[in-house]
Amino acid sequence: KGKGGHNLYHVKGMVYCDTCRIQFITRVSTMMEGATVSLQCRNLTAGTETFKAEAVTDKLGMYTIKVDGDHEDDICQIVLVKSPGQECSEIPNDVYSEQAAKVTLTSNNGEASDVRNANALGFLKKAPLPECPEVLKELDMYDVPGSVTQN
């Protein structure tokens, strides 16, 4: 429990370098140390910001943000803020990309644990690695954005 008997939540997540620019983790993705993420909560009705906190990832690409209090009437999400390096620093911004990881910060939804796991978020590498077409073939995917496939 947090201050004043409120619920205290621990939002945990991971940041990776999307080395194939496909917006999910593959065997050639790397976890990012020193990446900054922000947890932002907004009231569903008023649209006003009710909570904001930043965290920096550790050497395994993991972060934890403590949130004191219930945010049942809010929409809360983790967004990428800053990459530790230029080589992998692009934030995905096309319509289909997952720019934010939504988290529920209330105990009124049947979730008993105080730990909330956010989906992993990835910065895009400037250009896909040369082995990406091979990696995608293993996954039965053949279209690597920005790469030239050879016949």
UniProtKB/Swiss-Prot annotation:
Disulfide bonds join C17-C88, C20-C132, C41-C76. Keywords: Allergen, Disulfide bond, Glycoprotein, Secreted. One of its GO terms (cellular component) is extracellular region. It is found in: Secreted. N-glycosylated. Contains fucose monosaccharides in the glycan structure. It holds the Pfam family Pollen_Ole_e_1. Glycans are attached at N43. InterPro entries: Pollen_Ole_e1_allergen. Its main location: secreted. The keyword Glycoprotein applies. The keyword Disulfide bond applies. Expressed in pollen (at protein level). Belongs to the Ole e I family. This is Pollen allergen Sal k 5.0101. It comes from Kali turgidum.
